[in-house]
Amino acid sequence: MSFELLATDGKARRGRITFPRGTVETPAFMPVGTYGTVKGMLPRDIEAIGAEMILGNTFHLWLRPGTEVIKKHNGLHDFMQWKGPILTDSGGFQVFSLGAMRKIKEEGVTFASPVDGSKVFMGPEESMQVQRDLGSDVVMIFDECTPYPAEHDVARTSMELSLRWAQRSKNAHADNTAALFGIVQGGMYQDLRMRSLEGLENIGFDGLAIGGLSVGEPKHEMIKVLDYLPDQMPADKPRYLMGVGKPEDLVEGVRRGVDMFDCVMPTRNARNGHLFVDTGVIKIRNAFHRHDESPLDPTCDCYTCTNFSRAYLHHLDKCGEMLSSMLNTIHNLRHYQRLMAGLREAIQQGKLAAFVDAFYAKRGLPVPPLD
């Protein structure tokens, strides 16, 4: 993997990540394919909406169908028939999400499988082996996602454990030719975040991610971290904000120097009939769309908007048709890709401020200040 910085506008960066399987223009949004599929999307649909890289979930694929099945297909790419780069998360966040079902020790985490209730163990070495078996292009270290809220001592202990696991992840990654990303933890505490970053830089990674955000903290707490952290991360490596978020969050992350994003929001919201447009969100389930012959978004070039009316999308949603989720997902993911393309072009032209002004004006919102 190589990263090239092509342009900057303030803290915002326009770059390109090159993998043997293809290039990813940044800032980039990666659709989430938890079980080896982006829900409701064929691989050709994912390509058609402009996504260049997707995310796979190590934890869930390890439990189901199991790496022994995926290895027979020579890895996740052939298994799911996606030709572009894949980033796999380490499973740390999913283990964190299990709450009382898990027990964390120095060696790793023991938990009850959400599939069949059996006792399962995962540590850094296991996570690295699973990701090696999946054949992902970007491997994430195994870490503990610091909960919110957390007292300073709790956040410090969690961060220090994650650093030790980061070193073990690096050791276990060994001769794997895939890129390995570290994850900055430390909760909402700047001193802990900076210690985490320093420790990860000393270990040495191909890219760095910001973890432990969008875990229940207020928006202003997340922004506070983004105000200082990305700018302190190495300029010659990709910066990845994990699990975030809304279109506004992507814009604010880009303004502060983030290069990569992922989130289930566009796909999950699509299945609930919440569709993103430049002015905000359209709830296609609402009755007043029943007779609306206009496209969902006349400015959008996706298959959904160029072929179907709001009335048809409303009808499919009310009937619970499978096609409803599929068409909604195509639109939402294309909306996110168009947003990222607009941000890239604005940075390239040195016109990000004007782009951001227009973005918030369409939503009737003030532009948030930059620290």
UniProtKB/Swiss-Prot annotation:
<dbReference type="InterPro" id="IPR004803">
    <property type="entry name" value="TGT"/>
</dbReference>
<keyword id="KW-0671">Queuosine biosynthesis</keyword>
<dbReference type="GO" id="GO:0101030">
    <property type="term" value="P:tRNA-guanine transglycosylation"/>
</dbReference>
<dbReference type="Pfam" id="PF01702">
    <property type="entry name" value="TGT"/>
</dbReference>
<comment type="similarity">
    <text>Belongs to the queuine tRNA-ribosyltransferase family.</text>
</comment>
<keyword id="KW-0328">Glycosyltransferase</keyword>
<feature type="region of interest" description="RNA binding">
    <location>
        <begin position="243"/>
        <end position="249"/>
    </location>
</feature>
<feature type="binding site">
    <location>
        <position position="302"/>
    </location>
    <ligand>
        <name>Zn(2+)</name>
    </ligand>
</feature>
<dbReference type="InterPro" id="IPR050076">
    <property type="entry name" value="ArchSynthase1/Queuine_TRR"/>
</dbReference>
<comment type="pathway">
    <text>tRNA modification; tRNA-queuosine biosynthesis.</text>
</comment>
<protein>
    <recommendedName>
        <fullName>Queuine tRNA-ribosyltransferase</fullName>
        <ecNumber>2.4.2.29</ecNumber>
    </recommendedName>
</protein>
<comment type="function">
    <text>Catalyzes the base-exchange of a guanine (G) residue with the queuine precursor 7-aminomethyl-7-deazaguanine (PreQ1) at position 34 (anticodon wobble position) in tRNAs with GU(N) anticodons (tRNA-Asp, -Asn, -His and -Tyr). Catalysis occurs through a double-displacement mechanism. The nucleophile active site attacks the C1' of nucleotide 34 to detach the guanine base from the RNA, forming a covalent enzyme-RNA intermediate. The proton acceptor active site deprotonates the incoming PreQ1, allowing a nucleophilic attack on the C1' of the ribose to form the product.</text>
</comment>
<feature type="active site" description="Proton acceptor">
    <location>
        <position position="89"/>
    </location>
</feature>
<feature type="binding site">
    <location>
        <begin position="89"/>
        <end position="93"/>
    </location>
    <ligand>
        <name>substrate</name>
    </ligand>
</feature>
<feature type="binding site">
    <location>
        <position position="305"/>
    </location>
    <ligand>
        <name>Zn(2+)</name>
    </ligand>
</feature>
<feature type="binding site">
    <location>
        <position position="185"/>
    </location>
    <ligand>
        <name>substrate</name>
    </ligand>
</feature>
<dbReference type="GO" id="GO:0008479">
    <property type="term" value="F:tRNA-guanosine(34) queuine transglycosylase activity"/>
</dbReference>
<dbReference type="GO" id="GO:0046872">
    <property type="term" value="F:metal ion binding"/>
</dbReference>
<keyword id="KW-0819">tRNA processing</keyword>
<keyword id="KW-0479">Metal-binding</keyword>
<dbReference type="InterPro" id="IPR002616">
    <property type="entry name" value="tRNA_ribo_trans-like"/>
</dbReference>
<feature type="binding site">
    <location>
        <position position="143"/>
    </location>
    <ligand>
        <name>substrate</name>
    </ligand>
</feature>
<feature type="binding site">
    <location>
        <position position="300"/>
    </location>
    <ligand>
        <name>Zn(2+)</name>
    </ligand>
</feature>
<comment type="subunit">
    <text>Homodimer. Within each dimer, one monomer is responsible for RNA recognition and catalysis, while the other monomer binds to the replacement base PreQ1.</text>
</comment>
<feature type="binding site">
    <location>
        <position position="331"/>
    </location>
    <ligand>
        <name>Zn(2+)</name>
    </ligand>
</feature>
<feature type="binding site">
    <location>
        <position position="212"/>
    </location>
    <ligand>
        <name>substrate</name>
    </ligand>
</feature>
<dbReference type="InterPro" id="IPR036511">
    <property type="entry name" value="TGT-like_sf"/>
</dbReference>
<dbReference type="GO" id="GO:0002099">
    <property type="term" value="P:tRNA wobble guanine modification"/>
</dbReference>
<keyword id="KW-0862">Zinc</keyword>
<feature type="active site" description="Nucleophile">
    <location>
        <position position="262"/>
    </location>
</feature>
<keyword id="KW-0808">Transferase</keyword>
<feature type="region of interest" description="RNA binding; important for wobble base 34 recognition">
    <location>
        <begin position="267"/>
        <end position="271"/>
    </location>
</feature>
<dbReference type="GO" id="GO:0008616">
    <property type="term" value="P:queuosine biosynthetic process"/>
</dbReference>
<dbReference type="GO" id="GO:0005829">
    <property type="term" value="C:cytosol"/>
</dbReference>
